[in-house]
From Swiss-Prot:
One of its GO terms (cellular component) is nucleolus. This is Uncharacterized protein C31G5.21. Residues 26-43 have a biased composition (Basic and acidic residues). InterPro entries: FAM32A. It comes from the Eukaryota. Transmembrane segments: none annotated. Residues 1-49 are annotated as: Disordered. Residues 11-25 have a biased composition (Basic residues). Coiled coil: none annotated. Pfam families: FAM32A. Disulfide bonds: none annotated.
Length: 118
């Protein structure tokens, strides 16, 4: 018995090649530019991002922050900036070396000793 790989072949049905539609890059670029210019609010044009606007709306409606909460927010922001700075300075080789060290430190599931009878 011969086995033929692939999809099921039907008799008297001719396969039509699929044609991909090509997008016009000029029209697409115009639409993107038009959309981005239309969506900008006056605050975004002044340098305030959408994230900052949403964040300020959330804090205005909530109770005022305590000193501890303010300190926590500032420390969290500093750590995030420091982490981003460190990641930016790493080369691809550094990232690969770090990943390999992580994998070496982990034990594989089949290296674990068997526990109990069996």
């Amino acid at each position: 018995m011969d086995y033929v790989g692939g999809s099921l072949k039907l008799k008297n049905v001719k396969k039509k090649p699929l044609k991909k539609k090509k997008k016009d890059s000029k029209k697409l670029a115009e639409k993107v530019q038009e959309h981005s210019s239309r969506d900008k609010s006056p605050l975004e044009e002044n340098g305030v991002s959408t994230y900052q606007m949403l964040r300020s709306k959330d804090t205005d409606s909530a109770m005022p922050m305590t000193e501890a909460q303010k300190h926590f927010e500032s420390v969290q922001e500093q750590r995030l900036l420091q982490k981003a700075k460190n990641e930016r300075l790493k080369t691809h080789k550094d990232r690969i070396d770090e990943y390999n060290r992580l994998l070496e430190s982990q034990s594989e599931h089949f290296d674990m000793p068997k526990i109990g009878p069996g």
